[in-house]
Curated annotation (Swiss-Prot):
Keyword line: Cell membrane, Coiled coil, Endosome, Membrane, Protein transport, Transmembrane, Transmembrane helix, Transport
Job description of the protein: Involved in the targeting and/or fusion of transport vesicles to their target membrane.
A Gene Ontology cellular-component term: plasma membrane
Native organism: Arabidopsis thaliana
Domain Longin: 75-179
Lineage: Eukaryota, Viridiplantae, Streptophyta, Embryophyta, Tracheophyta
Protein name (database record): Vesicle-associated membrane protein 725
Length: 285
């Protein structure tokens, strides 16, 4: 009795295997994810064009979603008034971010708070606060680079103008899409962000060294000025001392001459008295 061979389709197993490789090998780097999407979709496309296209767009959508989950919420505020905000997710992170905003110091600085596996990153500058909520595993470098990009773009568009009088959430339509673009860019280009951060850190370090050297030079300049002032004072004091010395010498000379004249006068008087007493007055012959 002939046994018929039942063909088994390997497509589901291939799909699961490739998708598992995709998730486990490049889960933390969206940039590598997109490269893997292209290579895997080309391999799948060689089997079936239609299936390959569907596979490509499916993986690309997964990549985009995973990348966007790294930065989940952002806003720009004037004081405590949120002018524009953007998110594609739901959760209490918006309320937590707003509560942190109320307690932020008004001085220009950067702040990061950790809560429930997320980081709440703030950049405060000139009365405006830029915030982004990120997954804790992303670190601090990408969120801070995102805030710098948002700050520069926001200042170019609204610096000294509309933002100073805008009402709460009034800039959502104009600038909300920009927040989304900056989020996606920072997530898609982590290597570039890392390089820029290193360059900025080096520039900041060099700037700090230069400022320290300038302060030392200025400090030395102040010391030199003090030495010059002291030299001038010593020269002036020496001149005064010479003048006073001359006056004292003259005074002492006059005092000595006066004493000598008095002594000479006393001697002459004594001589006259002796002569007069011997001669019996002025009749001495």
């Amino acid at each position: 009795m002939d046994r018929s061979v039942v063909p088994i389709s390997l497509a589901p197993f291939q799909f699961l295997l490739v998708f598992w490789i995709f998730l486990t090998s490049v889960h933390t780097n969206p940039n590598k994810q997109q490269k893997t999407v292209v290579s895997l979709s080309l391999w799948w496309n060689s089997k079936n064009r239609i299936r390959g296209c569907v596979w490509f767009f499916f993986l690309l959508r997964v990549t985009r979603t995973m990348g966007q989950q790294n930065l989940i919420y952002s806003f720009v505020a004037r004081g405590t008034v949120i002018l524009v905000e953007y998110t594609e997710f739901k959760g209490n992170f918006t309320a937590v971010a707003a509560q942190c905003l109320q307690k932020l110091p008004s001085s220009n600085n950067k702040f990061t708070y950790n809560c429930d596996g997320h980081t709440f990153n703030y950049l405060v500058e000139n009365g405006f606060t830029y915030c982004v909520v990120a997954v804790e595993s992303v670190g601090r470098q990408i969120p801070m680079a995102f805030l710098e990009r948002v700050k520069e773009d926001f200042n170019k568009r609204y610096g000294g103008g509309k933002a100073t009088t805008a009402q709460a959430n009034s800039l959502n339509r104009e600038f909300g899409s920009k927040l989304k673009e900056h989020m996606q860019y920072c997530v898609d280009h982590p290597d570039e962000i890392s390089k820029l951060a290193k360059v900025k850190a080096q520039v900041t370090e060099v700037k700090g060294v230069m400022m320290e050297n300038i302060e030392k030079v200025l400090d030395r300049g102040e010391k030199i000025e003090l030495l010059v002032d002291k030299t001038e004072n010593l020269r002036s004091q020496a001149q005064d001392f010479r003048t006073q010395g001359t006056k004292i010498r003259r005074k002492m000379w006059f005092e000595n001459m006066k004493i000598k004249l008095i002594v000479l006068g006393i001697i002459i008087t004594l001589i006259l008295i002796i002569i007069l007493s011997v001669c019996g007055g002025f009749k001495c012959t």
